């Protein structure tokens, strides 16, 4: 259904069929560190970067406690930071000073699926995102060298890809900010169950 939603839309179909290369690897340097990025699709002559994304709901917003504002799925999942980094590396590759166009083609997991094509170009926001990267570059370098473990945010693509379940957790842990004084009781019940199951 999701693929059909893409192919039935004239604009998205045009972007998909546009001459360009898929899964393009580019390398560059940012803040004194080597970076390697993978572009879902790159149309070099038009300097167009296309990223494919799925989301539960394209219009749903999330509250960000740091800013006190509600954010789109693209902001909440760090796609603007990704766009800022990819754009800088692409500029080095293309030997240009202006930004390439960065488009996210997104489809929702709803039935029927929603779809959208979003331009992420926003130089002020890119500058902010890059300043955040620079602020944490020492930590990023330590993670890359294997000297420290990355901090899990639970939102980005890396987190679910590397997530390992170590125990069954109470249902209420899915509710942000919700806690239950009986959590230790749940842990005891689960431990007793596992002990019995392994006997």
Language-model features, listed with the residues they occupy:
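Metal-dependent nuclease catalytic cores that hydrolyze phosphodiester bonds in DNA/RNA
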Residues: 1-39, 151, 157, 173-177
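Low-complexity, compositionally biased segments
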Residues: 4, 12, 43, 54, ...
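Secondary-structure boundary elements
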Residues: 11-18, 43-51, 90-100
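Residues in well-ordered beta-strands of folded domains
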Residues: 23-25, 42, 105-106, 160
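Non-catalytic protein-protein interaction segments used by genome-maintenance enzymes to assemble
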Residues: 26-80
């Amino acid at each position: 259904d999701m693929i059909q939603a893409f192919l039935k839309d004239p604009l998205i179909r045009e972007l998909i069929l546009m001459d360009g290369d898929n899964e393009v690897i580019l390398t560059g340097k940012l803040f004194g560190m080597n970076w390697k990025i993978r572009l879902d699709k790159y149309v070099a002559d038009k300097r167009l970067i296309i990223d494919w994304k799925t989301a539960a709901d394209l219009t749903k917003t999330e509250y960000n406690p740091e800013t006190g504002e509600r954010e789109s799925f693209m902001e909440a999942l760090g796609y603007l930071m990704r766009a800022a980094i990819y754009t800088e590396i692409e500029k080095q590759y293309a030997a240009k000073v202006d930004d390439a166009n960065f488009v996210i083609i997104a489809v929702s997991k709803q039935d029927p699926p929603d779809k959208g094509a979003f331009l992420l170009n926003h130089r002020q926001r890119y500058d902010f995102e890059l300043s955040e990267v620079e602020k944490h570059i020492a930590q990023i370098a330590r993670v890359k060298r294997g000297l420290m473990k990355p901090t899990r945010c639970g939102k980005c693509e890396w987190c679910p890809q590397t997530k390992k379940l170590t125990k069954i957790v109470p249902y209420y842990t899915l509710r942000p900010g919700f806690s239950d004084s009986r959590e230790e009781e749940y842990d005891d019940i689960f431990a007793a169950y596992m002990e019995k199951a392994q006997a």
